[in-house]
Amino acid sequence: MVNFDLGQVGEVFRRKDKGAIVSGDNPEEEEDVDASEFEEDEVKPVRTKNRRPKEDAFTQQRLAAINPVLTPRTVLPLYLLIAVVFVIVGGCILAQNSKVDEVTIYYQDCMTNATSSWSDIPSEHWQFVFHKYKTYNTAPQWRFVDDESDDFTKQRGTCQIRFTTPSDMKNNVYLNYVLEKFAANHRRYVLSFSEDQIRGEDASYETVHDATGINCKPLSKNADGKIYYPCGLIANSMFNDTFPLQLTNVGDTSNNYSLTNKGINWESDKKRYKKTKYNYTQIAPPPYWEKMYPDGYNETNIPDIQDWEEFQNWMRPGAFDKITKLIRINKNDTLPAGEYQLDIGLHWPVLEFNGKKGIYLTHGSHLGGRNPFLGIVYLIGGCICAAMALILLTFWLFGGRKIADASSLSWNMK
């Protein structure tokens, strides 16, 4: 058996490695390694869409809340408080309305029923309300003055009306005209106008006729191809009975009560209505304006709708078939008690559709004209709340149970 020493084996290998290095058999050189290659690249966070609300008390619905327990002790006072407030407010409104004086006179058949001399107006044509003279019933009078030079036979001439006010009317004094059975809320009617014309633009026929929604159909141009200005059904049917700028004092003509047609419309409309850019050769008045413009437009008579407040008022259609619109006003002077005369030029026919037209004279109040509706609604609401409080009190006293009565628990009622 050959003796084999492991230590000699290790020596042999060490000599071999050493000889390899000396003989030039160099091992492959290791590639240089850049430490920066092992550094992690900066990773930019990617924002993902998240519809989750913010983490706060409001968006997460963690706000402090009160969940009251409704008991007769809390509900009864609440009903009573609401009843008292509603009754007080309703009473104040009715008291304010009861102090409003007004004169209403209808004159639609003045041309056919009134004579050339003064006569009493039928009782169904007028209504006077004076809070200091509740039984006042002196009938107003009228007479008709014909104008044979006017070829328009449906409505012509002047209707003269006399009425007496037994007490002063404090300013502001408002003179309105009233129309009944005139359906100004018809869909085709309220959409028949041109906003471009109202804003002063010289809109073409295609613009006023073919616009989607609001347009001037069926009154866009006349037989000569001229565009109606202003076009549409609303402008064409404008109320054109004429009213003077004063109430004539019958007893003292030197003390007439002055009126004005300025300040009768909303201030906001002054920014909407502008003077037109049309040339008079491009346009024609609407068909029903024939009495106002018998020879059409010229260089000087094109209406300036920016300052024509009666027209601006008319272009705001009423919501119902009864319309009341302001035509004259006096903001400075009290209307003294006395007999006054109002001369109305007749131009606007109503008998063809069984309508009515009249005047409405009032001084109004801080809450508007004489209308008890709102006050009555408040009183009814207050009475309902009081009745609910009484019913709840009755059930509580005679049909209720003790609060926190242990005998009413289900396991104690077996």
Swiss-Prot record:
Record-level GO cellular component terms: cytoplasm; endoplasmic reticulum; Golgi apparatus; phospholipid-translocating ATPase complex; plasma membrane
Segments on the Extracellular face: 96-372
Domain of life: Eukaryota
Disulfide bonds: 110-159, 216-231
Annotated segments matching region Disordered: 20-52
Cell compartment(s), UniProt: Cell membrane
Substitution effect: residue 51 to A: Increases glucosylceramide transport activity of DNF1 and DNF2, but not their phosphatidylethanolamine or phosphatidylcholine transport activity
Predominant location: membrane
Topology with respect to the bilayer: Multi-pass membrane protein
Key words of the record: Cell membrane, Disulfide bond, Glycoprotein, Membrane, Phosphoprotein, Transmembrane, Transmembrane helix
Resulting phenotype, residue 83 to T: Reduces interaction with DNF1
Additional record remark: Present with 2460 molecules/cell in log phase SD medium.
Family indicated by similarity: Belongs to the CDC50/LEM3 family.
Protein name per its UniProtKB record: Phospholipid-transporting ATPase accessory subunit LEM3
Source species: Saccharomyces cerevisiae (strain ATCC 204508 / S288c) (Baker's yeast)
Highest classification ranks of the organism: Eukaryota, Fungi, Dikarya, Ascomycota, Saccharomycotina
